[in-house]
Amino acid sequence: MTNERKEELQRQCSKFRNDLIDLLHSIQTGHPGGSLSCTEILTSLYFEIMHVNPENPEMEGRDHLILSKGHAAPMLYLVLAEKGFFPKEELKTLRQIDSMLQGHPCVHKTPGVELSTGPLGLGLSAGLGMAMADRIKGLDSYTYVVMGDGEIEEGCIWEAAMSASKFGADHLIGILDNNGVQLDGTLEEIM
């Protein structure tokens, strides 16, 4: 990656952060910390790494992203809107009853969302299933799972990690958002 491209992505991250604060302030609800801490992760994936097509979100052979830490959905929505999955005007409907943008990602409502998430710890298992299914189909796509550091205390995360190793799921990429904070305090205080 060139320095110019890196600076461009950094500017985009700054814009996403500002937009997130404005968005959550306007609706007076949301999880700003979890969304802010995954800004670089989601920006890098969607604007530099992943093979996706906003005009055809169900495209065969696309890469997949699972936001296992579903409470960070507002940042995902900002990124998806900027990428062109849906009009930016939809962001104003965040967390409204009939909105396509619920408090947690919903695969049935939001273009570009691959899995409905909310309960922590389930994303890596689902991602393993997606990666294995793509391998069986002969596809060269990748599945990226963004997890929070608090959720890796869940046993099912480690079962999925062991299974991924056993079955050689080399197209499954787990990404840990290590921000050091859980809902009730710091990681050191909770665990």
Model-derived features with residue positions:
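N-terminal capping segment at the start of a domain
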Residues: 13-29, 177-178
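N-terminal hydrophobic or amphipathic helices/low-complexity stretches enriched
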Residues: 1-16
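Short, contiguous strand/loop micro-motifs
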Residues: 7, 29, 63, 78, ...
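A short, conserved beta-to-alpha structural element at the edge of catalytic cores
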Residues: 166-190
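Cofactor-binding active-site loop characterized by glycine-rich and histidine/acidic residues
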Residues: 20-23, 35-166
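Hydrophobic alpha-helical scaffolding
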Residues: 6, 10, 66-69, 187-190
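Charged helix-capping and loop-helix junction motifs
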Residues: 157-159, 188-191
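Structural motif
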Residues: 28-36
